[in-house]
Amino acid sequence: MNEQIITILAEDGTKTSKIRKLLLLGLTHREIANLVTRGNRGFVWNVYKRMRDEGLIVSAGTPTATTTPELDYSFRRKFGVEIEAYNCTCQRLVRELTEAGIEVASERYNHDLRPHWKLVTDSSLNGNDTFELVSPILEGEDGLEKLERVCWVLDSCNVKINGSCGLHVHMNAEDFNITTWRNLLLSYKHAEAEIDKFMPASRRGGSNTYCGSLIQFPDERIRSARNIRELQGLFPSRYMKVNLQAYSRHRTVEFRQHSGTSVLQK
């Protein structure tokens, strides 16, 4: 590997700064994604687009009829996360996150949407100094960068994860139609056995009270649903691997199967 590339990868800077330098070296988006973002080409595309808009990179020009148009991998969707963990007091977390420039408040357990990160208690968690850290609405690459900063703080506070902890991800679903919902549920259901293979035992199958399996629901019942309300009636609990009840409150779909983590790449 080129010595310049090795030096850049070894730097303490952010992924964004490394991507910018590698782009200036002339590496392809795919090469950079494999080196820096574990294959996430959307992240690289966003950095490239920003550099191009700033005039730091000259685009190859207008595509001709024989040129393959450049695909837009940019990530713009709104999302939110809930991180469950233990081994750090809320007081310390508030202090450390605030010092890192993250607006955060410690609150009683609630489902209210806030413009800031909130720390709440959760009776389902085991361990000392348990907590759930809930994000405000995040969006696109900027949201991922904020999440990266939060994960860095959690790591510096030596937070820990056990089998009772989960990572819940909300994705904006305001633009979903019934076909999107059906396809999402059927795809997840049919892939669930494979997804289980890279999840810890505590979050596989239907053994976890807080992330129930979709496998038990017949395909024909999903396909015959005419709207989101009928699908919510089929999946009435929010404690499912794919939670449809979140749509009524937040206009999101919530993915609940992932095990707890403070590692951004996961």
Question: Can you annotate each of these PLM segments?
Answer:
Residues 130, 160-176, 252-256:
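Histidine-centered divalent-metal-coordination microenvironment in nucleic-acid enzymes
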Residues 53-157, 244:
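Terminal catalytic/cofactor-binding subdomain
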Residues 10-27:
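Short, amphipathic alpha-helical "recognition" segments used to contact nucleic acids or chromatin
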Residues 80, 120-125, 181-261:
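Aromatic/basic-lined ligand-recognition segments
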Residues 87, 137-141, 173-177, 259-263:
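A generic structural motif
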